[in-house]
């Protein structure tokens, strides 16, 4: 039977003890998609936003968010991340920006939450920087695409 790892036998929340786990290379990839009006995407791509270059600032916010995940999500471990990558791919046909994040470390616990947090905060930053010109921005499809390493091994979302 499956059980929640962050709940003890008494039903109390706790941070999982990873002290007996082996150090392995762990990697996670996540994504999000930000949909907007065509004119908003055109503003972003022309760097005409009065708040600055949206894609540069969103990428930096995503990197920072991965590093601060443990500060945002109470039961996450503070981790020494070795790689954080945030890719932003505008799709002019669909008026979207696809966000793909990759986080890596050599450690005792996975980095799925860091990759998901990076994707989420990148999307939220795009929203924040563009909300004055587009109230219809939508953030969606936040999901884990792949994870490698650790006891559970390699997992990949099919049809990606």
UniProtKB/Swiss-Prot annotation:
Keyword Lyase part of the UniProt annotation: yes
Q: What class of enzyme is it?
A: lyase
Q: Where is the active site?
A: 128
InterPro entries according to UniProt: MoaC, MoaC_bact/euk, MoaC_sf, MoCo_biosynth_MoaA/MoaC, Mopterin_CF_biosynth-C_dom
Q: Where does substrate bind?
A: 75-77, 113-114
Q: Which UniProt keywords apply?
A: Lyase, Molybdenum cofactor biosynthesis
Give GO terms for biological process: Mo-molybdopterin cofactor biosynthetic process
State its Enzyme Commission number(s): 4.6.1.17
Name the protein family.
Belongs to the MoaC family.
Q: How does it assemble?
A: Homohexamer; trimer of dimers.
Question: Which protein is depicted?
Answer: Cyclic pyranopterin monophosphate synthase
Species source reads Ruthia magnifica subsp. Calyptogena magnifica
């Amino acid at each position: 039977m499956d059980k929640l790892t962050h709940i003890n036998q008494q039903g109390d929340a706790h941070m999982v003890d990873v002290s007996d786990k082996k150090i392995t290379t762990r990697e996670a990839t996540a994504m999000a998609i930000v949909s907007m009006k065509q004119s908003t995407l055109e503003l972003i791509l022309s760097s005409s936003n009065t708040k600055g270059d949206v894609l540069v600032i969103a990428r930096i916010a995503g990197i920072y968010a991965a590093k601060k995940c443990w500060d945002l999500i109470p039961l996450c471990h503070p981790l020494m991340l070795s790689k954080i990558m945030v890719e932003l791919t505008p799709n002019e046909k669909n008026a979207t920006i696809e966000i793909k994040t990759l986080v890596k470390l050599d450690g005792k616990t996975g980095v799925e939450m860091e990759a998901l947090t990076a994707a989420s905060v990148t999307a939220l930053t795009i929203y924040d920087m563009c909300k004055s010109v587009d109230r219809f921005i939508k953030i969606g499809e936040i999901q884990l695409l792949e994870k490698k390493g650790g006891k559970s091994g390699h997992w990949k979302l099919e049809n990606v």
